Design a protein with these regions (language model features):
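Extended, helix-rich structural scaffolds rather than catalytic motifs
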Residues: 3-197
């Protein structure tokens, strides 16, 4: 609501980010999923360098929330993977770890999306003082971000995430336990992501 009354407090913005190896595609999946849950739009770009390049569009506050949450979850994801045991019968430890990471990321993204949906419902419900106004602001912000991304990249296609390996279920279970900051406000000054030069 503050952004609607005083647009100078929060403006649409975008940044191009480089996600380094190892596991760049999995990290990109996590970042894009969190960004989408927090009303940002992510476009994967071709790059000759190893890793993945992503152009992220969103309001400045949503970009910051995505950045802070991504940094926090990434640390938890690496910690969880370090403690995970690859089964002795597993034919490819790398495939098992990649599927574990995808399971973790998918669980976290799903939880953040559900938390954002619940927060929006509370803010726009009949008991909320400015419910209908909040709904309009959220819808307008989503429209503005989508239009900015489409203006920059009129032709895009949806990327599919696939995996092989049997670690997905274990990773998903660990992602269900990850701290996503539900119920508290987190602010951060540090940049977890590397801005492209």
């Amino acid at each position: 609501l503050l952004a609607a009354d005083r647009p100078e407090t929060d403006r649409p913005a975008n940044r191009i980010l480089d996600i380094d190896n190892p596991w760049a595609r999995v990290k990109a999946h996590l970042l894009c999923g969190l960004g989408s849950a927090l009303r940002c739009q992510c476009i994967l770009l071709a790059t000759p360098q190893p890793g993945t390049r992503i152009h992220v569009f969103g309001y400045a506050s949503d970009l910051e929330r995505t950045d802070v949450l991504y940094a926090s979850v990434l640390i938890q994801m690496w910690h969880g993977l370090a403690g995970a045991q690859v089964p002795a019968w597993c034919r490819s430890a790398r495939a098992w770890r990649r599927s574990w990471l995808l399971g973790f990321a998918t669980a976290v993204i799903s939880r953040v999306r559900a938390a954002e949906h619940a927060a929006a419902c509370r803010a726009t419900g009949p008991e909320a003082a400015a419910g209908s106004r909040t709904a309009l602001v959220l819808a307008d912000r989503s429209h503005v971000v989508r239009a900015e991304a489409e203006r920059a990249y009129p032709l895009t296609r949806t990327a599919r995430v696939t995996y092989s390996g049997s670690g997905y279920r274990d990773g998903y279970a660990e992602g269900q336990r990850a701290d996503i900051g539900t119920g508290r406000v987190t602010r951060g000054r540090g940049r977890a992501l590397t801005r492209a030069s």
